[in-house]
Amino acid sequence: METPVRETDLPPVVISGPPKTGGLRDRLLELLPEGGNLNLCLTCGLCSAGCPATGGEDMDPRKFLRLVSLGQEDEAARSPWVWQCTMCQRCIYACPMSINIPQLIYYARESWPRDERPKGIRGSCDQALKTPTNSAMGVRPDDFTFVVEDILDEVRETQDACKDMEISINREGAEYFLNQNSREPATEPDEMVPLWKILKTVGCDWTYSDVGWAAENYCMFLSDDKAWEDVVRNKVEAVERLGCRYWLNTE
Amino acid sequence: MTATYDALVVGAGVAGIRSALDLAGTGQKVALIDHSPHLGGLLVQLDKQFPTDNCGMCKMLPLTERESSSQFCMRKGLFHSNIDILLSTRLESLEGDPGQFHAVLRKHASFVDPTRCIGCGKCAEVCPVEVKSEFNAGLEARGAAHLPVPQAIPNHYVVDLDNCVRCWRCYDACPTKAIDFKFAERESFNILVADPDPQTTADLAEWLKKQKFPIEGPVDGNSVLERAAEGKDVRLLILDMSLSDVSPERVLSRCLELNARLPVILTGTPEQAEAARLLEQGALAFVEKPLDRAKFVPWLDKLYMRIVSDEIIEIDAAAVVLAGGFSCYDPSEVADVLGYGRSPGVVTSLELERLVSSTGPKGRGLLRPDGRPARRIAWLQCVGSRDLKKKADFCSSICCMISIKEANMVRRLTAEQEGGPAETTIFSMDLRVFGKPFQSYLDEAKASGTRFIRSRIHSIIPDPADPGAVRVEYLDDAGVLQVESFDLFVLGVGARPPAGMNELARAAGIETNEWGFCKTMPFEPARTSRLGVFAAGSFSGPRDISESLVMADAAALGASRLVNIYAPLRERRPQPEPEFRDVTRERPRVFVAVCSSCPMVESRLDTDALTRRLRAMSGVTGVALVDRACTSQGWDRIIDKAREVDPNRVVIGACMPYAYVPRLHELGKALNLNPALMDVCDVATLTALGGDDGEGTDSEVFSRLRMSVAKLLGADPRPTAQARPASPVALVAGGGLAGLTAALAVADHGYEVHLVEEREELGGLAMNIRRTLDGEDPVKHVELLIDQAGKHPNIRIHTDSRVALHLGRAGRFFSVVNTPDGPVPVEHGAAVLATGGVESKLYEWGFRVHKNVMTQQELEQRLADGTVDTAGLNAVAMIQCWRSRDEERNYCSRVCCQQAVKNVLELKRRRPELPVFVFYRDIMTYGFMEHFYTEARRTGAQFIRFSPDNPPAMEHRDGKTIVSAFDPVLGRNVEVHADLLALASGIEPADHSEIAEMFGVEMDEHGFLKEAEYKWRPVASTKYGVFVCGLAKGPANMEESIAQAQAAAQRAVRMLHEKHLASGAVVAEVRHSLCSLCGKCIEVCPYEARRLSPTMDKIQVDELLCQGCGSCAAVCPNSATILRGYSDRQVLSVIDAALEETV
């Protein structure tokens, strides 16, 4: 037996004519160079073998792509699996045909009505939009400043090597503008310290800002283009306000 | 001086060797060169090949005229009287036109004098350098002084100058002073410095004091020119770009005009970019100033060694064959995902070959990196193939079979281990088993327990639970993610153009294709873009051995055709056959000559005592010590001394016995004595290896010479069989593409050809094909061939005719052709069977009942003639492997997937939105055809794999065919409501039973004509003198059929060229009175030289086919089979001589 035949209740995919136009697939074919190479799939399974979301919702990247290729794009896009993708890009990184599966997933997510998209992601995006820090956890500017200073004091006191450590917030003209995932200041503040030490060791000239410092961007994961843009713009403005040369994003 | 050859063959791997042997076999002089220091190319590293699981390279050696060539294992080496082999040699330039090429070759020095090297290895022991060993695929280190391959004969150490650190330790360690680093010549290596800055000269004089190079300078441009004009001795010119009185360009070009080989080094600031342009005009190198002493001095010293020891060889040749082979993809660039170079348990397929070889890296073997036995071994296919990202939109064609073979090797090697053979798993996409015997090979591998999983692997990581192993995740065939650990993970690396391809292409003036391999011409698979230059083997694309040899034959044929225009082979006077006297009735008189100047003889051998002891032997009539037997003066002395005693047996004690084979022929002529009554015995190795004090050397050498004397005393002195005259005519059966191609190729060599076609028209199956995958027009090509054949003065065409009778043996056949005008008798020396194949007939599944069901070939025709209206179609389905690769017909028809892809592209060109579904088992678009499969997918056509135990189901409803199949990717059925269904029917052999019986050739299990040996003799039938090609031999596309036809023609020409066919001196005979007709000898004969007589009462030996291997004599229970030259009595007396107490 070469191929174990699995019992399946799913109805067959029926092909009786040219696929309908104007769907997800066409959008990809139009927008990406070479159509994101969508048609080139060798069905080799490499993407699915390397995908952290394989197996969830009985779906994997190869199967997802196959559904789209066979014109079953509505079924594919409707699968809750699209929300399990982490956008890590491991698939396209190793795909011998450079097929842009993450982009396909992005468009599939977009096809969901906003209020039906997963609450967690949506909530995080909304939260980020509400605060000038863009923190998905709602950390406010003054909270952030307090936590950073508090941890800095503690480190200076307890660690000899850090006695003279300086952290600046809102310092204009620093070379680097450092972003920080808001999970750290909100729940694991000690986790910020290792990076500080590295930056100190290499003699980096950097600063935090009390706004636009949150590195995460759930609006991207939500496939909400407008909100994603708003968040990025706010962060860029924060960088430009301080006149930093580099924006160091840790996400 | 310029040497003149008929052909130059570049690359001495199997393809180059085969081309060279082909040409040499038709009396052409060949120069065979290779850039590496050994023969055999990649094959020296591979112990076994698929699908035979053994080696068999020696089967390429000539079967007749055997004495012109060496007759031993080809992994060790090759000698042929018509082939000059130049190793460590590259082609630098190729000027001129077809028929009169002028080639410049550069032979890199090995710095070891082969006449002095005794292979003791002391140089390698002391060498401090450690670089990756090429032979063991980098799995162990070698020194700069090293032995390139362990098995070569003769085998000398070489110094690899690029990696040498110039410590000279090997020079001091060599006991025979074989290593020459050109110390003495340094003092006469005049270096002229033309640099306005006097500091440069002063620096160089100081820095190079130890090297003892005479430095002269600084001089200005005018004085350089003066010196050059006077022809004063300058060995190297250092020319600075800031020279002002004469421009550096002018100095350079004038100097090179006067002495084209003057080495010139340019110096200058980095900004002096014009230097780069000058480099192209012939300067050796550009060195940036300021000069860095630590780098410049060793660099210059190495350059000096190259200049004084490299040899520039100029040759004239009528034609050139390029057989540069291929290289393996280096997976280091994907180390981040596949772990190669990071996890030691990840190896390439070539490395695995070395790990399981008996000559593999010391202390490795089939072990995990932590030293435990490797019990779980996996292979991953398509590493560096079928991958757009790696610019490899092609299939490497050979890796699937290599991995299956390696799995077999591993299972055999580990069969005795506790727990049975190791677990073997192959991860792949399509399994490309498109060669005729490959499907059965795959089936056997599956049956023996190798697991095949259809998944490429994303990443290979160290196993967190077992650091000696690696871990992968993959989708199983049911689409479920699995995690598994393996002890070794083998990357089936794809093919790439050979290293140095660009330089070779530039030197040879040929174009490359978009993947960097040699570009070839449509319908001329061996022709490169340059007339008179041909491509052999895998130089024009990845191929297995069998196909490489076909391409080598085809390339040789192209070269030979060209050579023949300038110096017709038929008109060449053959070497007069020497007549030897009959010494049967004479008492043996043995003459023994011992070379006294082999490196260690003088110090370790008591030559007086040896002479005395040899003289005392019965039958020995003369003994002579000869100085430098390897030189022609030394050889003349042997002849003189031998004439004095008039011997009828001759033993020569010297070095390198194999090198003396052509010399023995000279001696035979001089003494009028058959060389079969002569023997060369290696005394040099014995003296070299006999312990440090040489104790025991005397008796060892004496014992060895005594064995040779005993062997000759027992030799059968009867003259060897008389040569049979060959008839210079060929018969070609079949007038399709292959038959026409073969007939024209033979006829162009001046031989008469009878072309016999059953049907009324020539052309065959190719006339049904409208277009090749590359867009060429086959019908036009075949019509051209028909026209050429019709006009050819040497071709007689018999259409509507059949061969009715065929008798005789190779070289002299007699056939009768029944033509509409009556029977025509033909006497011919060789036959080519190109009797073709047929598209399989389909009867089931609505074929011939429903109008919308047709074969792929019909679809092509109907698309071409407009009887299929693509505008009215809603969906098209295609089913591949409809009648191939099942129990009934267990081979891949090769052409169907190409045909399907071609039809897909045409349908999609006309109707891009039309759904086209191809149901397949494995898409077999091997080689560069993969590109068209990629393009077919790019159009949006869908390819759905089915398993043979669950084929697509069909239902005809309302003029449509509903094809329903399980898609393993989705895990559910796909149903295509097709207006049109195309079935790949496959290729079947024509009915060959009559022709096979008449010509006495065998058919394989499928009904195709069987090759004598699939791998090494791919166009020879099982009957000597009868060759097979095209679809008669097995499924093939047009290019492949053409190459096979040219190969078959090449073999036929080789046979017709031999005005006399003579067997070798060592052949088997049967003493019929002792024979019990048990037939064991017939089974073991690897050359099919034995058969039961038609009267069923005798075992017959075809002495042309018999190669004297002795397998028959070994299995014969009654000693009824004897090997001439190896009688029992003779062999026993040799053993006695070896064991006899030394007095």
Please report, for each region that a protein language model flagged, where it lies by residue.
Chain A
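Ferredoxin-type iron-sulfur electron-transfer modules and their immediate structural context
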Residues: 1-84
